[in-house]
């Protein structure tokens, strides 16, 4: 569905959408969450993520930021949390569409048609998160294209990449990306230039 489709959702803040979910974060979300908690991105990634990629959950598989009062980081919650119960899909050509997810079992939230998807995005402060997610996706797409071109020219590299992919599929968390740790990345870059951050 498009942004113009009639849609509304009244969240009851029951917290059911905060359980049994794997929330992947991008650098913008890491920065927002780290600042909300008064941490550097380095400390945030170490304390609150799994391999610097997904938000950590408690042993009961509930988001570590869910408290009895609700989401402890609500003003800076990730895009996927802002969109719920919508999912957003963007094609490689940049075409955007939304899908409505099935409600979590027992969720008392109410669906309706009082507004539009666009209204829902605005009410949840999604626009800066959407822009940053698109920029992150574009960077990933560019890196992927360059990597594919490199592999096409080097059969040994292609075989190695295949082995690495198989290794990553062995039910292990993915390796942490230094790009997600913007504080460390910026600090190392400034140090290399002989500048103080």
Feature roles, as predicted:
Residues 1-197:
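Short loop/turn segments that flank or connect secondary-structure elements
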